[in-house]
UniProtKB/Swiss-Prot annotation:
Keywords: Magnesium, Transferase. Homodimer. It is an enzyme of class 2 (transferase). Catalyzes the transfer of the phosphoenolpyruvate moiety from enoylpyruvoyl-2-diphospho-5'-guanosine (EPPG) to 7,8-didemethyl-8-hydroxy-5-deazariboflavin (FO) with the formation of dehydro coenzyme F420-0 and GMP. This is Phosphoenolpyruvate transferase. Inhibits intracellular mycobacterial growth by inducing apoptosis in infected macrophages. Induces macrophage apoptosis by triggering reactive oxygen species (ROS) production, release of cytochrome c, and activation of caspase-3 via a TLR4-dependent pathway. FbiA-mediated apoptosis may act as a host defense response. Was identified as a high-confidence drug target. Pfam families: CofD. Belongs to the CofD family. Pathway: Cofactor biosynthesis; coenzyme F420 biosynthesis. The keyword Transferase applies. HAMAP family: CofD. Transmembrane segments: none annotated.
Amino acid sequence: MKVTVLAGGVGGARFLLGVQQLLGLGQFAANSAHSDADHQLSAVVNVGDDAWIHGLRVCPDLDTCMYTLGGGVDPQRGWGQRDETWHAMQELVRYGVQPDWFELGDRDLATHLVRTQMLQAGYPLSQITEALCDRWQPGARLLPATDDRCETHVVITDPVDESRKAIHFQEWWVRYRAQVPTHSFAFVGAEKSSAATEAIAALADADIIMLAPSNPVVSIGAILAVPGIRAALREATAPIVGYSPIIGEKPLRGMADTCLSVIGVDSTAAAVGRHYGARCATGILDCWLVHDGDHAEIDGVTVRSVPLLMTDPNATAEMVRAGCDLAGVVA
């Protein structure tokens, strides 16, 4: 079975672990009766968070997925590498280099150095990610939504001079923790970008497509902002199953509720499902899973409530199984 997941952030990476647990891929292959040829997992990953930091190209969501599936992620933070040190960052602070609010670990720097060198040599991000994955062996194809620049920027009221300005998502998210007056999101470069060939192929070839319970605005929404992705979803022959990132009007993690309020969407499972919309109309969903106790009615979408707490890969695998069952796909 070929599974393609739209994913971003720590939640997206943990969801991918659950898919691997169910299918016996990656870290779970040794205990599985399935062969690698039986199943294939592809992830179309958000690149809206990508930024130039200290002259290096940083791709947080791609790296979080790569480290998580490769067994090297910091388990406490859910991002970055385990056993990380911060000597380079401390020295940069002593030099007074900005930004001082975005931390790059010493181990993590190696990833960004390789990526930046390959970008400067003319390689597209898709090929670079594949090369980086040779080191981590994540057991999945990690596919940037686009090889082009398509960055999420945020229009805020500056807390110092009260002017309205646009800042990079990372500054809004990491420096300000989304605690400044926020007016809108913009996907800079989207009009000149196109979906990566590998991402489109993964959607077309899938037996089932899943929307991870990632932030619907700045993760899944940023992927959908890439020209060609939404059309590929609507044209796909595979059923599309979405997972609510909202449980009892609160996000599973992160600040999805803050992002939703900016675009005028309530922080409920039903509202997020309607935001995505039914594929039989103008949206992208065939099925929508909400947490036990939540309720949603969405015209044209089959809805079911199941436990959606990703407490460990086994619990997440049961979420994935429930999505397959709802879509009529045998895992």
